[in-house]
Swiss-Prot record:
PROSITE patterns: EF_TS_1 (PS01126). Transmembrane segments: none annotated. It comes from Desulfosudis oleivorans (strain DSM 6200 / JCM 39069 / Hxd3). SUPFAM superfamilies: Elongation factor Ts (EF-Ts), dimerisation domain (SSF54713), UBA-like (SSF46934). Keywords: Cytoplasm, Elongation factor, Protein biosynthesis. One of its GO terms (cellular component) is cytoplasm. Pfam families: EF_TS. This is Elongation factor Ts. It is found in: Cytoplasm. InterPro entries: EF-Ts_dimer_sf, Transl_elong_EFTs/EF1B, Transl_elong_EFTs/EF1B_dimer, Transl_elong_Ts_CS, UBA-like_sf. The keyword DNA damage does not apply.
């Protein structure tokens, strides 16, 4: 494909929120294929996010969300590098969506290292008993249990979870896309989820 039309660049910008030149570069690299260009920009965004991940995040907001007629409530602290970014609609939307994700999925922690050791050990023991009950050979038990623990992390760790609004990506992917979009490091610092009667 020779030249990339302005309408194609505009369509990609609307889909991804990326800058005009980034969209043009992605479309050129992907011969005008918009779906490949979206993936190209996502990969580029991950690289940008990795570069920014070491920066200090001392600004941000505490977002709250009340769900199901007041029966579930969430507070989440999301940090960024500057007060300016903390006030943007993109950042506020990210914090709001993360709070909604927490309300919907009740994660055990933000990342695998945040899952309480006693909960992890209890899960490991349950999985081990299940695998032994299935009659699997002893030399395979630990590998199978490790696989089940990885699945547990995908379900129980916020960053590893599928994003409920777009199951094709994880919350970690969504965070990286938002970092690429706003140009600053973002960190989900902590959260609390309350459910009536729990």
């Amino acid at each position: 494909m020779g030249t990339i039309s302005a309408s194609l660049v505009k369509e990609l910008r609307e889909k991804t929120g990326a800058g005009m030149m980034d969209c043009k570069e992605a479309l050129t690299a992907c011969d005008g294929d918009i779906e490949k260009a979206v993936d190209f920009l996502r990969q580029k965004g991950l690289a940008k996010a990795a570069k920014r991940s070491g920066r200090e995040t001392s600004e941000g907001i505490v977002e709250s969300y009340i769900h199901m007629g007041g029966k579930i409530g969430v507070m989440v602290e999301v940090n960024c590098e500057s007060d300016f970014v903390a006030k943007t609609d993109d950042f506020k939307e990210f914090a709001r969506n993360v709070a909604m994700q927490i309300a919907a999925t009740n994660p055990a922690g933000i990342a695998p290292e945040d899952v309480p050791a006693d909960l992890l050990e209890r899960e490991r023991q349950v999985y081990r008993a299940q695998v032994l009950e299935m009659g699997k050979p002893e030399n395979m038990v630990d590998k199978i249990v490790d696989g089940k623990i990885k699945k547990f992390f995908k379900e129980s760790c916020l960053i590893e979870q599928q994003y409920v609004k777009n199951p094709d990506i994880t919350i970690g992917d969504y965070l990286n896309e938002t970092v690429a979009k706003i140009g600053e490091s973002i960190r989900i610092k902590r959260f609390a989820r309350f459910a009536l009667g729990e």
